[in-house]
């Protein structure tokens, strides 16, 4: 018996020795987990100074463990969190590290995951992670997923060259770690950050099944090349009562467990032009809070078979997305584990990658003016002149004499033919406002007085009533002309200009403009739109469109003083000012709180200007929001009464007369200039809700601004703030 026992011990020792040798072989990174909150089936595959990365091979499930506080982030549903009420499809979805959809014929709803679908995964281990090569036999397609832990960041990438498909089925979408950092009902305290407008949060509390859907928005707005054209419905044939949702300006989202002091900011680095941000609170299909990026690889669309659209066929795109699909998770802990930490992390990321450069942040109130419009008159259209160059000089002189020492002014409707004679092909001003020479003199003369006048150029649209659009108009993927229609007065149909035609048109305009010795330009249209389109039998994706627009903006920025209207993040590096920064979100029902996230990222780098103050229903609250976000005020004014616009396309500008808002401009200028002098070019370091209705903004130069949205005076942290007011503490 003793001999048998000794022999058994020898066998066990030999097996342990073999196991130790295997784990020490080059390229083999599997290490048995030891942490109490790491299931035994997970093996450690990478480690940095701050984190350990664990992997469960069958489902490509990973766990991130913070080495300092021991907190973890799970990427798939753990057994102890399974409430047992989900069907097999959803259970498989939540247990899989990657989820795809497949397109077969005209159906794009097949779920493809690592649990319910036959697959083969082979792993190759690297110094800081692994590469998983995945093949789905049933659909005869596959891809590779590279996962690497670099310091405080987890990078997840599907290389473009690793994607393969065969004729039996196509890949529709790819969702990487769709449960990363999930939580069950209200088991965790915290929130999901979504880039809706300036920013919003969805709390991780129990939603009691109130919502049927969550946040699902395409990065950089919807793709007009695939969507059907619609006509605006106006109240009393005049007023647009439907507010468009805010666009996703930046490819980011986040999850934060505030009590555990761990979370992440996710940056969609590659493939973002064809990806959506998904953030679904518990109760939306399942009882788990989750956020992720969903990449579109191929779409189906409806193709008309004839010009009358009497016959159609649903088909998949002829080609797939050709781009890496990559998400970078910036891991945040301790004092950085909140949305302020997310904002700082994103700003530092942009700066480190040359995507955000410091512009002149000197304070200037923005006062825009409308030059000319058009209205129907018998057979022809006639000019409706609202503000001439002489009248602008008169108003400038009035403001200057009342202490407004600097100004930024965008001149709209300056071009021959008025505001909606687009695209603008050359520098030629409308004679009704004084002509080209008068506009040039206005810009150059007042620049010496620190009044910067920018000419507005809407470069996306083409007006078929005023210009030949035969060779310039965009056609959608289905080869039908892309038209924007409305029931407004005068002009009711516009086309998009082909991106490469836009490049040619803008090059000629900028050349003719700068030849006159002026170079202040406010660019719009192409700054907040990208789309797929067809041309001469070829299809062009949003990647192609964005690349063209980026080149256009970059080239113009080298030749002009360029300010951009609500630009997408990939254009921020070339913006000397950000026009029309949203101060809120789309106010979806599932959003619990709005935060000035984008403003926190950009403050101190790019001057930001609000939407127009004179069209705000609650000007007092809007003023406080601007102060809180570090955004400068904007006005859209005319010398003549706005009643003159009643029969023009600008009939919605119901209150613009300068005399009405003169005193407001002067007062806003004095107040915001004083605040800007205190904050200077400092960054926002923190944003906090210190009490109900009272917010605190801390700058990195030590300045603190308290904003009180309540009607009564409030004392917080030893500082008293009057009702509906703000206080700067240096």
Task: Describe every region a protein language model picked out.
Residues 16, 20-24:
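Hydrophobic core
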Residues 328-368, 372, 376-408, 651-682:
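Terminal accessory/anchoring regions of large secretory-pathway or extracellular enzymes
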Residues 35-355, 718, 722-723:
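N-terminal accessory beta-strand-rich subdomains and adjacent acidic, glycine-rich linkers
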């Amino acid at each position: 018996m003793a001999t048998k026992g000794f022999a058994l011990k020898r066998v066990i020792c030999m097996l342990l020795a073999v196991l130790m040798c295997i784990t020490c072989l080059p390229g083999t990174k599997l290490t048995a987990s030891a942490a109490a909150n790491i299931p035994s089936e997970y093996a450690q595959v990478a480690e940095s100074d701050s984190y350990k990365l664990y992997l469960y091979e069958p489902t490509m499930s990973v766990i991130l463990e913070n080495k300092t506080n021991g907190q973890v982030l799970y990427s798939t549903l753990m057994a102890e969190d399974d409430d047992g009420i989900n069907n097999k499809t959803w259970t498989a979805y939540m247990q899989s590290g990657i989820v795809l959809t497949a397109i077969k014929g005209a159906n794009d709803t097949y779920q493809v995951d690592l649990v319910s679908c036959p697959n083969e995964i082979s792993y190759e281990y690297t110094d800081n992670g692994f590469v998983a090569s995945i093949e789905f036999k049933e659909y005869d397609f596959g891809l590779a997923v590279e996962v690497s832990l670099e310091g405080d960041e987890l990078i997840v990438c599907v290389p473009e060259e690793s994607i393969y498909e065969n004729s039996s089925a196509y890949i529709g979408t790819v969702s990487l770690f769709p449960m990363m950092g999930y939580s069950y009902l209200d088991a965790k305290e915290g929130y999901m950050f979504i880039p809706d407008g300036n920013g919003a949060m969805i709390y991780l509390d129990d939603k009691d099944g109130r919502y049927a859907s969550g946040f699902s928005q395409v990065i950089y707005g919807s793709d007009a090349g695939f969507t059907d054209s619609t006509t605006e419905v106006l109240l009393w044939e005049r007023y647009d009562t439907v507010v468009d949702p805010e666009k996703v300006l930046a490819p980011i989202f986040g999850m934060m467990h505030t009590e555990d002091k761990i979370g992440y900011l996710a940056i969609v680095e590659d493939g973002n032009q064809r990806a959506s941000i998904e953030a679904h609170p518990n109760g939306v299909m399942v009882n788990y809070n989750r956020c992720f990026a969903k990449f579109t690889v191929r779409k189906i669309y409806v193709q008309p078979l004839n010009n009358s659209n009497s016959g159609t066929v649903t088909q998949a795109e002829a080609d797939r997305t050709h781009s890496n699909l990559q998400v970078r998770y910036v891991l945040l802990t301790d004092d950085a584990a909140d949305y302020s930490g997310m904002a700082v992390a994103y700003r530092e990321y942009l700066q480190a990658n040359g995507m955000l450069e410091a512009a002149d942040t000197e304070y200037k109130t923005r006062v825009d003016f409308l030059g000319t419009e058009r209205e129907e008159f018998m057979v022809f259209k006639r000019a409706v002149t609202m503000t001439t160059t002489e009248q602008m000089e008169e108003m400038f002189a009035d403001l200057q004499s009342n202490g407004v020492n600097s100004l930024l002014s965008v001149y709209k409707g300056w071009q021959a033919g008025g505001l909606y004679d687009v695209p603008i092909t050359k520098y030629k001003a409308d004679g009704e406002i004084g002509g080209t020479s008068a506009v040039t003199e206005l810009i150059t003369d007042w620049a010496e007085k620190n009044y910067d006048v920018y000419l507005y150029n809407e470069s996306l649209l083409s007006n078929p009533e005023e210009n030949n659009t035969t060779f310039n108009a965009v056609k959608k993927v289905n080869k039908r002309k892309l038209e924007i229609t409305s029931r407004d007065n005068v002009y009711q149909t516009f086309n998009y200009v082909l991106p490469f035609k836009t490049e040619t048109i803008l090059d000629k305009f900028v050349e003719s403009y700068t030849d006159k010795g002026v170079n202040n330009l406010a660019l719009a249209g192409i700054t907040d739109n990208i789309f797929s389109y067809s041309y001469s039998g070829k299809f062009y994706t949003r990647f192609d469109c964005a690349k063209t627009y980026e080149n256009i903006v970059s080239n113009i920025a080298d030749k002009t003083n360029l300010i951009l209207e609500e630009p997408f993040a990939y254009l921020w590096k070339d913006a000397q000012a950000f026009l029309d920064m949203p101060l809120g979100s789309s106010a979806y029902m599932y959003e619990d709180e709005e935060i000035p996230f984008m403003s926190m990222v950009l403050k101190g780098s790019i001057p930001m200007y609000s939407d127009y103050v004179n069209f705000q229903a609650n000007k007092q609250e809007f003023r406080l929001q601007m102060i809180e976000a570090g955004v400068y005020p904007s006005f859209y004014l005319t010398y003549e009464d706005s009643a003159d616009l009643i029969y023009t396309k600008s009939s919605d500008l119901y209150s613009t007369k300068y005399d009405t808002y003169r005193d407001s401009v002067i007062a806003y200028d004095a107040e915001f200039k004083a605040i800007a002098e205190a904050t200077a070019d400092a960054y926002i370091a923190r944003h906090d809700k210190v009490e109900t209705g009272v917010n605190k903004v801390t700058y990195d130069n030590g300045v603190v601004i308290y904003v009180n949205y309540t009607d009564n005076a409030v004392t917080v942290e030893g500082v008293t703030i009057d009702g509906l007011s703000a206080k700067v503490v240096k």
